[in-house]
């Protein structure tokens, strides 16, 4: 398991201040505002590195699901002046959540229809893990309004991207059917830009590393926070391709949701569906904060402006939430994107009980496909307690709807 420890410098313990749910420390003379109770040692190292950046703006924010990442913790929110950091966005650019409420009462859906027609139908129509469609999907599903011919990575990946759109991916990506606290069926899914986002992220991070070395940058290469300045043409190139990946990730989720709705409507012809809620959690955007126009990097964090509707999923077999943002300026109008890992995937496989995980899900009558130890990578025990995460961000979001899983498909 990842070690949960105090901040690297003991003197920081004396600098800790609490403001409702938020805690504040100073690191390298930079305020770090935290909504997280425990942070692993790797994440603390990344926080220390981030606070050395000369272009960091105002403060660094860490959401309650924060844990170690690559360059920047997952659950981190970083504002910068005049630079973008590809690794502070991550490689699953535009990854996010979407959810749809139906008019169907869960108790009125026959179990055999749920298992044999709906869940089986989803598995047949939506490729999972590293799988993709054998044939390119219709171009109408792809993002529009972009000059892809000027995009180095996207342009050469368009053919394969048309086979990836409408696919779930692996890791912590999922499709869930859920029961709302009023008894109605919801559909929720978590997915991103597939291999396209990874190709774009890796390409521009490597480009930034090369340029930073050429410029004798003061940002050390070993902290994995290479940057592209606004004045450089590479900034505009990355920004255009990042925005395309965000749009592609949304198009990917929309296509999957449309096909899930079709499957449900085929099985239950009286089904109707409300408009889709969508929110991304890996991206950078120009925003105004504390009187200045800055670039906000959200890596495993979502925008939570006043009245903004969002989605915060729990871990496998636990509650998920539809929320309303409270627009807290101290978090750069952000909140968590989920529960957040408490242990690595390898530690979860090594230490958690397969029998206990299956028994826990089946005791709740949740339809699942857990078969082997590798499936423990995404077990609930590998994640933080979602109820504690939500309590820690009571000043960031307000819970509107509580959702409980009835069936889950993992990538």
Task: Label the predicted regions.
Residues 1-17:
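BZIP DNA-binding basic region
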Residues 5, 9, 95-98, 180, ...:
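Generic recognition of cysteine residues
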Residues 13-14, 98-100, 345-346:
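Iron-sulfur (Fe-S) cluster-binding segments and ferredoxin-like electron-carrier domains
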Residues 19-24:
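Low-complexity, highly charged intrinsically disordered N-terminal segments
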Residues 25-46, 55-62, 68-74, 78, ...:
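Domain-length cofactor-binding catalytic modules of enzymes
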Residues 51:
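Beta-strand elements of modular eukaryotic interaction domains
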Residues 66-67, 95:
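Acidic, glycine-rich active-site loops and adjacent beta-strand->loop/helix elements
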Residues 88-148:
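A generic, well-ordered mixed alpha/beta core segment in the N-terminal half of proteins
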């Amino acid at each position: 398991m990842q070690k949960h420890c105090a901040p690297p410098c003991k003197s920081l313990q004396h600098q800790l201040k609490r403001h409702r749910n938020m805690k504040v420390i100073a690191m390298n003379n930079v305020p770090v505002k935290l909504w997280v109770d425990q942070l692993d040692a790797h994440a603390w190292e990344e926080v220390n590195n981030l606070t050395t950046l000369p272009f960091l703006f105002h403060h660094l924010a860490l959401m309650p699901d924060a844990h170690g990442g690559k360059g920047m913790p997952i659950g981190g929110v970083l504002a910068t002046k005049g630079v973008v950091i590809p690794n502070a966005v991550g490689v699953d650019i535009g990854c996010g959540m979407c959810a749809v409420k139906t008019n169907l009462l869960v108790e009125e859906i026959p179990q055999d229809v749920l298992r044999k027609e709906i869940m089986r139908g989803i598995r047949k129509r939506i490729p999972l893990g590293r799988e993709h469609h054998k044939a390119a999907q219709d171009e109408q599903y792809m993002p529009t309004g972009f000059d892809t011919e000027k995009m180095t990575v996207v342009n050469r990946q368009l053919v394969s991207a048309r086979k990836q759109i409408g696919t779930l991916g692996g890791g912590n990506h999922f499709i869930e059917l859920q029961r709302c606290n009023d008894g109605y069926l919801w559909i929720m899914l978590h997915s991103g830009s597939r291999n396209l986002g990874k190709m774009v992220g890796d390409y521009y991070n490597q480009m930034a590393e090369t340029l930073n070395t050429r410029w004798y940058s003061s940002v050390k290469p070993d902290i994995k926070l290479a940057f592209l300045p606004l004045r450089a043409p590479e900034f505009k190139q990355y920004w255009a391709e990042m925005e395309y990946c965000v749009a592609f990730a949304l198009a990917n989720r929309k296509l999957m949701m449309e096909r899930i709705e079709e499957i449900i409507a085929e099985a239950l012809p009286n089904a109707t569906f409300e408009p889709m809620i969508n929110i991304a959690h890996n991206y950078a955007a120009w925003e105004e904060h504390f009187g200045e126009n800055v670039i906000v990097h959200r890596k495993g964090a979502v925008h939570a402006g006043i009245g903004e509707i969002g989605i915060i999923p729990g871990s496998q077999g636990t509650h998920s939430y539809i929320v309303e943002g409270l627009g807290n300026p101290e978090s750069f109008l952000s909140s968590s994107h989920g529960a957040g890992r408490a242990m690595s995937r390898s530690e979860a496989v090594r230490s958690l009980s397969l029998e206990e995980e299956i028994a826990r899900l089946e005791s709740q009558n949740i339809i699942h496909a857990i078969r082997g130890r590798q499936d423990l990578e995404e077990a609930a025990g590998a994640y933080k307690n979602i109820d504690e995460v939500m309590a820690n961000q009571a000043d960031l979001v307000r819970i509107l709807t509580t959702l409980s899983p009835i069936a889950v498909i993992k990538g």
